[in-house]
């Protein structure tokens, strides 16, 4: 299972899914036996990066390679929150803006709404850092 894999390996990947991957991405939310690879149950393919031992999801528009740091038990819903460091970040080049901001909608990255709803984000605007008593300016209108 995912939790034991993280604890045993100390590393894990987080892979954003695109619109074409939502069916298989949703299938991965099922609780498989720990001996079953989710890659064997979907059309998603493994991808390994040089010098990194944990698999990514091939064709994922954003891929994060994370190191386990700590965890906190949350009694209110009987779950564990994992704290991790992002050691490597891979993404499709067209998603990177001039100011090095990653625009997820350019990669057709899917957002999840609840447990079973999927949507495509659309950027409405970006703003400068907010400061008291100073007008807020749009970064998009200023060419960011």
Model-based region annotation:
Residues 1-144:
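Basic, polyanion-binding surface patches
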């Amino acid at each position: 299972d995912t939790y034991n894999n993280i604890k045993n390996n100390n590393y894990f990947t987080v892979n954003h899914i695109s619109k074409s991957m939502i069916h298989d991405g949703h299938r991965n939310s099922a609780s498989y036996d720990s001996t079953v690879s989710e890659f064997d149950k979907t059309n998603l393919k493994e991808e390994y990066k040089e010098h990194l031992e944990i698999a990514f999801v091939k064709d994922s528009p954003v891929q994060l390679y994370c190191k386990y740091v700590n965890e906190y038990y949350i009694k209110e819903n009987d779950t564990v929150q994992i704290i991790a460091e992002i050691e490597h970040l891979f993404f499709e080049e067209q998603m990177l803006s001039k100011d090095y901001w990653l625009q997820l909608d350019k990669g057709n990255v899917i957002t999840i709404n609840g447990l079973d709803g999927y949507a495509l984000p659309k950027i409405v605007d970006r703003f400068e850092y907010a400061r008291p008593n100073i007008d807020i300016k749009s970064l998009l209108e200023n060419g960011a």
